[in-house]
């Protein structure tokens, strides 16, 4: 069965490899692709990040976005880039959306506000940025948890497909479920914390349906093989597993 990892932070350089432990410091783009394909993953998506402190202004984010495009050139059909925007830089973010749209890039994120010095999804600048994303029917993957209501953003931009990253603990899972029940344009990716809890995937499928759950790992922070086995280990019907591992991402990304 094909596996699409919706949530990876790819890299060519050490500064962009978000590994936790020094034993993984020698990984490069080739090693990254080998690890992922050995886990059964045939396609990845996501934004490039850096271990370095972010400099003031939008230039640092723009460089990460260009690195994502360079990785697409080297990785070919293996990788769908995601790109960064920032509500403190409305004009630059809108220009970046236009730039990426012209190149066929439809995925914003994963957006990681705590790394980039912002924490709002409801300000005027953010809404203006998302208005343009709505015009282009883009996808927006964002880091969770957040301690504010995402409802206004979701309601105001029905043409944007929002993807919340990380199921989280039991309380957070229930918050995801309630928000997803109110907003049909909200999906959840399985990366990061949460999937190791036995039964969480089956619970999500029961509550919101398999069609709105995307496989993701958060590699290289997390071990991709563990996530593949966590999905397979739920012993869900084959057609449900197929939707989660690849079908939903393929549909949303128009692969």
What is each of the regions a protein language model found here?
Residues 20-27, 52-62, 86-93, 116-122, ...:
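Acidic-and-aromatic substrate-binding clefts and catalytic sites of carbohydrate-active enzymes
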Residues 8-10, 48, 83-87, 109-112, ...:
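A cross-domain feature marking catalytic cores of carbohydrate-active enzymes
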Residues 1-10, 15-43, 210-212, 225-255:
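Mid-to-C-terminal alpha-helical segments outside catalytic/metal-binding sites
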Residues 106, 120-214:
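Catalytic pocket-lining loop regions of alpha/beta-barrel enzymes
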Residues 9, 30-56, 79-84, 106-110:
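Divalent metal-dependent hydrolysis catalytic cores, especially in the metallo-beta-lactamase
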Residues 7, 36, 68, 100, ...:
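Conserved, mostly hydrophobic/aromatic
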Residues 58-139:
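Active-site gating/metal-coordination segments in enzymes
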Residues 1-22, 62-84, 184-187:
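Mobile, glycine- and charge-enriched loop segments
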């Amino acid at each position: 069965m094909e596996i699409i990892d919706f949530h990876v932070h790819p890299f060519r350089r050490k500064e962009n490899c978000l590994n936790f432990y020094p034993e993984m410091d020698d990984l490069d783009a080739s090693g990254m692709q080998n690890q992922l394909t050995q886990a059964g993953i045939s396609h990845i998506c996501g934004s490039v990040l850096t271990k370095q402190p972010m400099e003031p202004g939008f230039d640092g984010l723009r460089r990460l976005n260009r690195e994502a495009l360079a990785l697409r050139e080297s990785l070919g059909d293996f990788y769908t880039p995601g790109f960064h925007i920032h509500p403190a830089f409305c004009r630059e973010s809108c220009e970046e959306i236009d730039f990426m749209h012209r190149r066929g890039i439809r995925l914003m994120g994963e957006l990681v506000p705590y790394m980039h010095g912002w924490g709002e999804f409801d300000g005027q600048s953010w809404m203006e940025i998302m208005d343009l994303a709505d015009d282009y029917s883009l996808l927006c993957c964002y880091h969770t948890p957040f301690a504010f209501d995402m409802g206004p953003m979701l309601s105001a931009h029905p043409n944007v497909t929002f993807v919340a990253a990380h199921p989280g603990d039991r309380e957070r899972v229930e918050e995801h479920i309630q928000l997803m029940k109110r907003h049909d344009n909200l999906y959840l990716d399985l990366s990061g914390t949460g999937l190791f809890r036995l039964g969480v995937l089956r619970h999500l499928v029961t509550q919101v349906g398999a069609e709105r759950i995307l496989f993701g790992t958060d590699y290289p922070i997390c071990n991709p093989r563990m996530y593949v086995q966590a999905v397979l280990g739920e012993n869900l019907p084959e057609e449900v597993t197929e939707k989660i591992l690849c079908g939903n991402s393929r549909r949303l990304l128009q692969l």
